[in-house]
Amino acid sequence: LAAVVILIGFGIYVAYQNSYTGMLKKGYRAVNEKEYMAAEKYFDRAIIKDKSRPDAYVGLAEIYLDQNDTDGAEDVYLSAIETQPTNEKLYQAAIDFYMETKQPEKVASLLEDCEDDNVLASVSEYVCEAPEFKPEEGTYKEVQEITISSDTEGEIYYTTDGTDPTAKTGKKYKEPILLEKEGTTEIRAIVVNMKGIPSGVISQTYTIE
């Protein structure tokens, strides 16, 4: 009986060691020991077992981050999303990566390329709609007040010097922009949502004659 119990226990141990969770544990241990090739092998084996779960991709990205290769870590997520464009958890993992590595501006680009409504709904708090201008760009013979708005809750920032605005370099939009002098003015604007994620830059050019 004791032998049977031992065999069962050993079988459970082996099963765990070869399970998804077991591969993750081995992978992170290898990362901590700077054994990156071994870590990659373990995380790849975990992905083979279940490619839909984000944990192993996070582990693969950690291999690159541990070597100060942020671009390599980013490629892990983008490649996974390319093959699984409807995987909500992968998108969330990629967003977490961008936020943790202080690259919130890349979240907007990631979600702009997403065509799956379920994914967009699951990460709706991160979605940042680009601003809209009224009136539209063009040539006018009289003074114009340019209104900038967005359906996204957050702050609008703009520039009139031809540079792309950021929350640090742009002017915070508080009231319509008055164009009263003759000449051409390019207004560029973004929205920064409550998560600190900026939208894409929208540019409109106005000429007052």
Where would I find each of the regions flagged by the language model?
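Long, contiguous interaction/recruitment modules in multidomain scaffold/adaptor proteins
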Residues: L1-G22
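Start-of-helix register in tetratricopeptide repeats
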Residues: T21-G22, D55, K89
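Conserved structural position within tetratricopeptide repeats
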Residues: N32, D44-I48, L78-E82, D116
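Short, compositionally stereotyped local motifs that mark structural "simplifiers"
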Residues: T70, E74, L78, E88, ...
